[in-house]
Amino acid sequence: MRNTVLTLVLLFVTLASKGQELTLPQLSQYLADNPFVISPTYSGIGDHIKIRINGLTQWVGIKDAPDTQSLAADARVGEKSGIGMLLYNDSNGETKQRGARLSFAHHLTLDRYDDEFMSFGISYNFNQFRIDIENFRDNNDASVTDDRATTNHNFDVGILYRKDKFYLSANASNLLDKDLTKFNPVFEPNRLRNYYIYTGYRYKKSKNSDMEIEPSVFFQYFESDGRSVTDLNVKFRWYDFEDYYYAGINYRFLNDQIGNPLYIAPIFGLKKNNFYFGYSYQVILNEIMGFSTGTHVVTLGVDLFQGLSNCRCMY
């Protein structure tokens, strides 16, 4: 039994390491009304300077499980552009990474009467990745001589199309290959590119309705090992003037195992005045379920008033 537990833990730590390496792990943070974390094209959209702090603790109950903290902020610049910044700290067992992302987006109006817009975004990424061998059990392995660390400079590009309440974004992350001079090129992939597609629609029964339904889909493809995952989401919002409350569900699965979800996550949150709170609890539905109580995702935020743009492409 003990060997089975160790095997399962090692398996999922390995999978998480692949998702973790040189990028911010994408779980359900974007559903906390913060799609900027997955694409630079959302920089500056809205009439506020948006600040979001996120804490993510995976696989509660398993020692050295992944743990992530991030700070994201974006704001409008001029009438048709936006800038953003993302800082993150991520640990998974003996692997650690810290990074920053600086983003710029420009927003164009295709049809101002139909609220049809196109946005283009680019990000510069800085990442420090480290494998710490201090706590390795077998220090006599000749192949393990010291810590392994690398610094990566990279770029993201993205495009966003919006028409009325519909949106569709496509993003390519980490365009440049990784420097393998400090790693074994036989076992270490050098392709870091990830591809994201995010689309959804915000539906109201009538213009004056207090309730809004937002179904959405988030697709990720990892070039390093050919994996791909899909999120199916639905959110319900209830408005009270400029405040709102929401609740929903996030369903994630590997695309070759549609009927076997990785997790199902209830989500809820609220925006009151300029303050924001969001929470998600991911119920793990695979073999690790017997050893973990799940994953917690907490988001706190504040929207600082900036003033409306004269261009509807920024709304």
Segments the model singles out, each with a brief description of its role:
Residues 9-18:
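Hydrophobic h-region of N-terminal signal peptides that target proteins for export
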Residues 1-5, 110-112:
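Positively charged n-region of N-terminal signal peptides that target proteins for export
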Residues 20-315:
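Subset of outer-membrane beta-barrel
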Residues 4, 17-20:
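Acidic, two-metal ion nucleic-acid-processing modules in DNA metabolism proteins
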Residues 8-9, 180:
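A ubiquitous, low-specificity "background" feature that marks scattered single residues
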